[in-house]
C-alpha cells in the first residue's frame, strides 16, 4: 500500500536529517535559517514532548510497539477505503518509528528544528515529530468533515 511508502519516506528523511545533525553539529549549537524565527539547533531529548517522562525508555519502547501495532492494524482495516485516513496513518506510523529508532539506538531522540512563534521559544523538534503532528491534524480535519457530512 502507498501508505507504507509514506511511512518509509518519513523514516528515511527523519533518520538522514538526524544523522546529518549528529555528524555535523556539536550538541547545543544553532544555525539561524530565518533570524528570530527558524534555527537548526542540535538538541537531544530523553523523554517525550517538552521532555516529559525523561529517561523512561522502557515505557517508550512498550508504548511505541503497541501503538505501531495498532496503527498497522487500523491501516489494514480502514485505510483501503479512505485515502486521507491512510495518508494520516502513514505519517503517524513513520513518525512513531522514526523516534523509536532513535530511542533504541541512541537512548535519546535527536531534535533540531527550533522555531520561535511570536517570541515564544517553541521546544526543539524533528521530522518525525512533524509527521506525527501533521498526521493527527489531518485525522482531526477528517473527523470534522465527516461530522459535517453526517449532519447534512
From Swiss-Prot:
One Gene Ontology cellular component: plasma membrane
Protease as UniProt keyword: yes
InterPro entries membership: Peptidase_A8
Listed transmembrane segments: 55-75, 85-105, 124-144
Residues at the active site: 111, 129
Enzyme Commission code: 3.4.23.36
GO molecular function annotations of the record: aspartic-type endopeptidase activity
PROSITE patterns referenced in this protein's UniProt entry, alphabetically: SPASE_II
Subcellular localization(s) per the UniProt record: Cell membrane
Main location: membrane
Superkingdom of source: Bacteria
Biological process annotations from GO: proteolysis
Reaction equation(s) it catalyzes: Release of signal peptides from bacterial membrane prolipoproteins. Hydrolyzes -Xaa-Yaa-Zaa-|-(S,diacylglyceryl)Cys-, in which Xaa is hydrophobic (preferably Leu), and Yaa (Ala or Ser) and Zaa (Gly or Ala) have small, neutral side chains
The entry's keywords: Aspartyl protease, Cell membrane, Hydrolase, Membrane, Protease, Transmembrane, Transmembrane helix
Function comment: This protein specifically catalyzes the removal of signal peptides from prolipoproteins.
Protein name per UniProt: Lipoprotein signal peptidase
Organism: Bacillus mycoides (strain KBAB4) (Bacillus weihenstephanensis)
Organism lineage: Bacteria, Bacillati, Bacillota, Bacilli, Bacillales
Amino acid at each position: 500500500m502507498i501508505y507504507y511508502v509514506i511511512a518509509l519516506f518519513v523514516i528515511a528523511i527523519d533518520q538522514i536529517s538526524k544523522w546529518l545533525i549528529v555528524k555535523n553539529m556539536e550538541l547545543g549549537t544553532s544555525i539561524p535559517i530565518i533570524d528570530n524565527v527558524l534555527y537548526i539547533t542540535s538538541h537531544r531529548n530523553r523523554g517525550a514532548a517538552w521532555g516529559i517522562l525523561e529517561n523512561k525508555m522502557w515505557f517508550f519502547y512498550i508504548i511505541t510497539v503497541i501503538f505501531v501495532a495498532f496503527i498497522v492494524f487500523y491501516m489494514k482495516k480502514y485505510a483501503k477505503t479512505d485515502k486521507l485516513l491512510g495518508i494520516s496513518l502513514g505519517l503517524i506510523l513513520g513518525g512513531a518509528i522514526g523516534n523509536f529508532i532513535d530511542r533504541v539506538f541512541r537512548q535519546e531522540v535527536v531534535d533540531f528544528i527550533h522555531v520561535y512563534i511570536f517570541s515564544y521559544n517553541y521546544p526543539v523538534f524533528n521530522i518525525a515529530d512533524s509527521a506525527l503532528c501533521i498526521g493527527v491534524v489531518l485525522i482531526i480535519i477528517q473527523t470534522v468533515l465527516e461530522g459535517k457530512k453526517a449532519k447534512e
